[in-house]
């Protein structure tokens, strides 16, 4: 009998001996004899708890136990071709099945939950972690000339399989909420068996239409330079208009107050500079979502996108508290810098009102990135198209209306109202139009892993503040040469900041795509997206340069009526146009680094280039060589060129292994944050209430 059995097994096809559930499995070799009970196996433990009879184990097929939809058509991986079962018939008509499974009563277990799917994720991660044969089998099969490599592209199929299982887990979470309300639902979808050929199994025949579209998008098939250029263009244009509309708000504030007097205008300018520097900190914190949210979305962990949003908002609000205190007591702080008491008083009053609007700005910036991670880039246009004209109307009414106008402080109130209106309109869009898919409800996880978030946020703050402060320093240095030079520098800086929004929008779009691809483990497509983004940066820089060079006289006359100021602006703008090419490369390359999760590298490059090279060079050229505004812009432009070249090198020649490892660390950190009652125990207590497929 033993000889016949041995001879029969030796004639079995190699694919049946290497990837099946039983025979020849290199990870778990199950004896064909009677299986002893494994008390640590959660399936056996659950079965014992339900039946109280350890002798009811079965050798029925896993296909029969777990699947009723085995032979239904598969819309994702195609039909699974099942090979006929191989049986050995002895004299008593016994049979030897090629698959061995657990009791058929397992299929009668309660409805699946997200914890159930967690167990399946861990089990498949272990079971499919390798597709290689054992050493002995590999050596014995290496001599077969017609051996076919059956595992090409297996890793990509496995990644897609895991993404789909993650998506189904989130669907079950939504179903659990519906079930809690007493709503009936259909019988749970079943699993398809693992075939002898080792192909990735089809899971959950019933999938949400929205999830299906998302999973199809995650496949990222047929990505080429041309197709990616179309995608980035469709993402970038809405963002360009969004950022340009955002730049209108401070201009409206200055124009509205400017006619009240020079002290009021100076106070608004000083308060705007202070608030811009402060709010740039929270925008830098929000840039961490450029890494976290798109990567989570690309890997199919949709609800993690919402958790990252909550965590970043909570983190930002805590950081905002000391800055709010500083704004409230800004009057004594400003007295050490500015001697005019009236100017200090007006600035302090303006900042105290802005305290109420800063939280809304934080909400808006984070929610905007939450939507961008899902590929929703046009929401900002709709919101700002409504807010921009309303802001003009409200500002004029609160400042100049003889019935309800409150004068200077009305401009600050208008800014606060505008911030809150922007946030509520964007929230309405996310709730009722598009973007709610990644929201799984409020979670206590928002108050965990702040240390990991802080590393990304700190680097993002340095990247933004380094450039923001460098522009402010140029304005301060220009005041040394007189009022005309200060006015010219202010106009040129404002125009440069406005045009900077074009490459910045391209960079945000590119970083989102890169992070999506990294989350989907498609580094080849992420590299294509990086190349397209950098190519677009040269186009944007050239367009900005042409605008400043050929429109220099028109721009100068818009900003001033003073002949000397007009002349200075017209002379400096061509140089600033050349610098825009470097700044455009800098903007896109820095955004690509954020998409890769390499903010720390970008922060180091920005700090060293600006403050160890650019600013000192600007001071030397402007003061010692008497080049004045030319020297300032040559110095800062040289720093931008250096930053752009260094960052572009690391974008085009990245260490993908390091990037993917870091992305996996972020993913595992998020996945490890579960409640203690969701973990399996090794207890043999028959009365335990361990879930069948616990996480």
Curated annotation (Swiss-Prot):
Swiss-Prot/TrEMBL keywords: Membrane, Phosphoprotein, Transmembrane, Transmembrane helix, Transport
Transmembrane segments: 237-257, 265-285, 313-333, 344-364, 380-400, 408-428, 457-477, 488-508, 531-551, 565-585, 604-624, 633-653
Location in the cell: Membrane
Molecular functions per Gene Ontology: antiporter activity; transmembrane transporter activity; xenobiotic transmembrane transporter activity
Post-translational modification Phosphoserine, affected residues: 113
Bilayer topology: Multi-pass membrane protein
Entry-linked CDD domains: MATE_eukaryotic
Bias (Acidic residues) ranges: 673-688
A GO CC term attached to the entry: membrane
Note from the entry: Present with 195 molecules/cell in log phase SD medium.
Family: Belongs to the multi antimicrobial extrusion (MATE) (TC 2.A.66.1) family.
Protein's UniProt name: Uncharacterized transporter YDR338C
């Amino acid at each position: 009998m033993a000889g016949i059995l041995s001879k029969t097994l030796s004639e079995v096809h190699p694919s049946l001996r290497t990837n099946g559930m039983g025979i020849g499995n290199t990870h778990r070799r199950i004896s064909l004899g009677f299986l002893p009970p494994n008390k640590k196996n959660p399936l056996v433990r659950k079965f014992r708890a339900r039946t109280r009879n350890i002798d009811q184990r079965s050798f029925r097929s896993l296909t029969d136990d777990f699947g009723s939809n085995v032979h239904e058509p598969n819309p994702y991986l195609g039909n699974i071709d099942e090979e006929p079962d191989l049986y050995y018939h002895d004299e008593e008509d016994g049979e030897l099945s090629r698959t061995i499974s657990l009791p058929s009563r397992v299929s009668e277990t309660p409805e699946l939950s997200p914890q159930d799917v967690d167990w399946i994720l861990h089990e498949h991660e272990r079971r499919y972690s390798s597709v290689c044969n054992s050493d002995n089998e590999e050596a014995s099969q290496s001599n077969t000339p017609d051996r076919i490599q059956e595992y090409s592209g297996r890793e990509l199929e496995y990644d897609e399989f895991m993404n789909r299982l993650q998506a189904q887990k989130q669907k079950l979470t939504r179903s659990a909420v519906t079930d809690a309300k007493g709503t009936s639902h259909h019988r749970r979808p079943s699993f398809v068996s693992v075939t002898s050929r080792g192909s990735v199994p089809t899971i959950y025949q019933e999938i949400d239409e929205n999830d299906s579209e998302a999973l199809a998008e995650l496949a990222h098939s047929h990505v080429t330079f041309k197709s990616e250029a179309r995608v980035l263009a469709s993402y970038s244009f809405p963002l360009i208009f969004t950022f340009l509309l955002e730049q209108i708000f401070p201009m409206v504030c200055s124009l509205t107050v400017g006619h009240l007097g020079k002290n009021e205008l100076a106070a608004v300018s000083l308060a705007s500079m202070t608030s811009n520097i402060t709010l740039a900190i929270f925008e830098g914190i929000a840039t961490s979502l450029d890494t976290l949210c798109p990567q989570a979305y690309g890997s199919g962990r949709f609800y993690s996108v919402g958790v990252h949003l909550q965590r970043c908002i909570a983190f930002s609000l805590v950081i905002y508290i000391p800055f709010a205190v500083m704004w409230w007591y800004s009057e004594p702080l400003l007295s050490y810098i500015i001697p005019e008491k009236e100017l200090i008083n007006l600035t302090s009053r303006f900042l105290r009102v802005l305290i109420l609007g800063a939280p809304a700005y934080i909400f808006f910036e984070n929610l905007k990135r939450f939507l961008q991670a899902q590929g929703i880039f046009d929401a900002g246009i709709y919101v700002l198209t409504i807010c921009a004209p309303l802001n003009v109307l409200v500002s004029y009414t609160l400042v100049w209306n003889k019935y309800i106008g409150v004068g200077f402080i009305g401009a600050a109130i208008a800014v606060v109202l505008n911030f809150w209106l922007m946030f509520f309109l964007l929230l309405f869009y996310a709730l009722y139009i598009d973007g709610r898919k990644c929201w799984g409800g409020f979670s206590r996880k928002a108050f965990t892993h702040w240390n990991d978030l802080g590393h990304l946020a700190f680097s993002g703050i340095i990247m933004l503040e380094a450039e923001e402060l460098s522009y402010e320093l140029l304005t301060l240095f220009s005041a040394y040469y007189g009022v005309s030079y200060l006015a010219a520098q202010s106009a040129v800086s404002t125009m440069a900041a406005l045009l900077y929004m074009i490459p910045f929008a391209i960079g945000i779009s590119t970083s989102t795509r890169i992070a999506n691809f990294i989350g989907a483990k498609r580094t080849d497509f992420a590299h294509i997206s990086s190349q397209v983004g950098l190519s677009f940066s040269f186009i944007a820089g050239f367009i900005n340069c042409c605008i400043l060079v050929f429109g220099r006289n028109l721009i100068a006359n818009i900003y001033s009526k003073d002949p000397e100021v007009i002349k200075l602006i017209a002379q400096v703008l061509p140089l600033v146009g050349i610098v825009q090419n470097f700044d455009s490369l800098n903007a896109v390359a820095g955004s690509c680094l954020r998409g890769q999760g390499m903010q720390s590298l970008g922060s180091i490059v920005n700090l060293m280039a600006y403050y160890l090279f650019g600013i000192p060079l600007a001071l030397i050229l402007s003061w010692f060589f008497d080049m004045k505004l030319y020297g300032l812009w040559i110095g800062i432009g040289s720093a931008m060129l250096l930053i752009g070249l260094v960052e572009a090198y690391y974008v085009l020649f990245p260490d993908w292994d390091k990037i993917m490892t870091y992305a996996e660390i972020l993913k595992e950190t998020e996945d490890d944050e579960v409640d203690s009652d969701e973990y399996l125990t090794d207890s043999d207590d028959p009365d335990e209430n361990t879930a069948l497929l616990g996480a």
